[in-house]
Amino acid sequence: MEGIEWNRQNLAYQSLTEVPPELIERDGFKTAELDLTHNKISDLRFLVDYPHLTTLILDHNLVGSHVKMPSMNKLHTLWLNHNKITNLSTFVATLVKSCPNLRHLSMMNNEAAPSFFNGGTFQQYMDYRYFVISRLQKLDALDDKIIQENERAEAERIYGRSKPRKKKKKVEQDNNNT
C-alpha cells in the first residue's frame, strides 16, 4: 500500500502471554515484521489485527499443535523454534489453511520436528522434511536448509501433492429440504 511506512514491532523478552491491545491498535495495521521471541504466547488469534504481516518470529514461546491462527495471506516467513508443537500433521494443516504463501518456515527444537539435536534419527528428520515440503508447496526453506528440487520430488513421491479441500456441495442440503 502506497504511502504507509511499514515497521518492525519488537516485543521480544517481555514475558507476554498476549500482545497488549493498545500496541495492536497503535501498530497492528502498519506492522510488516513482528518479533515475539522469548515470551509466553500460545494463542495467535490476535494476528487478525496484523493484516500486512510478512515476517513473524515466535521462537521460545508456548505455541502448540492445535493453535488457532487467522488467515495470513501475506506472511512469508515464520519462525517457531523451541515451542510446544507435538503433532506435525495437525499443525501443518493449520499452516496450509492460514499461511498459504509461506516461503520460510523454521520449527527446530519442537517435538514434531525431529532432528539430531532433540533425539531424532536422520530418517525421522527426513520424513519430517518430506511431509512439510509436500504440504507447503511454496516453501523455499525449512529450518536451516534451502529446499532442493530432489527433496520436492521425493516428498511428492512419498506423500503426493497436497490438494486444496473442496467445499461440500449444496446438493446435500437441497436433498434434505425435499
Label each PLM-derived region with a short phrase.
Residues 1-42, 48, 52-57, 70, ...:
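Long, contiguous C-terminal flanking segments immediately downstream of a protein's structured core
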